[in-house]
Swiss-Prot record:
Detected in embryos at 2dpf (at protein level). Widely expressed during embryogenesis and in adults. GO terms for cellular component: histone deacetylase complex; nucleolus. It comes from Danio rerio (Zebrafish). Disruption phenotype: Morpholino knockdown causes defects in embryonic heart morphogenesis and pericardiac edema, with defects in heart function that are visible already at 3 dpf. In addition, erythrocytes appear pale due to decreased hemoglobin content. It is found in: Nucleus, Nucleolus. It comes from the Eukaryota. Disulfide bonds join 24-25, 33-69. This is Histone deacetylase complex subunit SAP30L. A motif (Nuclear localization signal (NLS)) lies at residues 81-86. Keywords: Disulfide bond, DNA-binding, Lipid-binding, Metal-binding, Nucleus, Repressor, Transcription, Transcription regulation, Zinc, Zinc-finger. A zinc finger (Atypical) spans 24-72. The gene is sap30l.
């Protein structure tokens, strides 16, 4: 009772969240969320969507990380998806392929990986971008890549059923040449 907590005292409270004891960085209705932080990070885009929908969520300035819990991640995604469905039902100009776009957090990637992506797709940017700017640029490009989902899934299922991969194909073709 000298102001220091002992190991016995710490067992009385709620269990410590996993991964370095980080909890969600959001404040909901003036109360800090106590759920364990997941791997989703609080970005400017998420902050913008929260303010547009007038949700009672804010970031706790006292924490040193930007990770949010899975509950809030799913909650924010569901609010965003409801809005997209409403615009497409009302006859809005929303294309069919953008209704169920999953959120991909490219900020989790390393800077070298983001640069390699930028170089591969020859994305034009100004020099000296920091990681956040680079991730945002790559994310915008990534969302606009057209994908033939049916063809991709059909090919994937075929490859799984035939127990082959591209590496198997390369080794088979090299054996035939010899």
């Amino acid at each position: 009772m000298n102001g220091f907590s002992t190991e016995e005292d710490s067992h009385d409270g709620p269990p410590a969240p996993p991964f370095f004891g980080q909890s969600c960085c959001l404040i909901e209705d003036a109360e800090r969320c106590g759920r364990p932080a997941g791997n989703a990070s609080f970005s400017k885009r998420i902050q913008k969507s929260i303010s547009q929908r007038k949700l009672k969520l804010d970031i706790d300035k006292s924490v040193r990380h930007l990770y949010i819990c899975d509950f809030h991640k799913n909650f924010i995604q569901s609010v965003r998806n409801k809005r997209k469905r409403k615009t497409s039902d009302d006859g809005g100009e929303s294309p069919d392929h953008e209704v169920e776009v999953p959120e991909v957090d490219l900020f989790q990637l390393q800077v070298n990986t983001l640069r390699r992506y930028k170089r591969h797709y020859k994305i034009q940017t100004r020099p000296g971008l920091n990681k956040a700017q680079l991730a945002e640029t790559v994310s915008r490009h990534f969302r606009n890549i057209p994908v033939n989902e049916k063809e991709t899934l059909t090919y994937f299922i075929y490859m799984v059923k035939s127990s082959k991969s591209r590496l198997d194909q390369k080794s088979d073709s090299s054996k035939q040449v010899e």
